[in-house]
Amino acid sequence: FIYPFVKTREWYLLTQFTRQGIMDEHIYVGNKYPSVKLNTTYCFGIDDYEFVVAFETDSPDDFLDLVQELRETEGSRYVKEDTPIFSCVAMSIEDTVKSLGC
């Protein structure tokens, strides 16, 4: 799942200490779903989004539960935009080319 998002201006007005506390809650929730691997890419200045997060899992139900629980955390107050979410299938470059009929 590919999940681009943008933080609010209010997020950046918080102290580093406060932001770290909010992120600690985020990390705690994420650790409850060990089947979901998280990869964060910062893209500020490259695209319309500030971050793109890639979640890797063979359990879509776990991903959906994780996202729902994260939306109930303090950190969600500071998310300005978090859509669209893209569902993807991991495959080799060779298999990707074959799937395109090339």
Pin down the residues of each PLM region.
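Glycine-rich beta-strand-turn "strand-cap" elements at beta-sheet edges
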Residues: 33-48, 74-102
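Short, well-ordered beta-strand segments in beta-rich or mixed alpha/beta enzyme
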Residues: 1-6, 45-70
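Mixed-charge, polar/low-complexity N-terminal
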Residues: 25-27, 35-38, 59-60
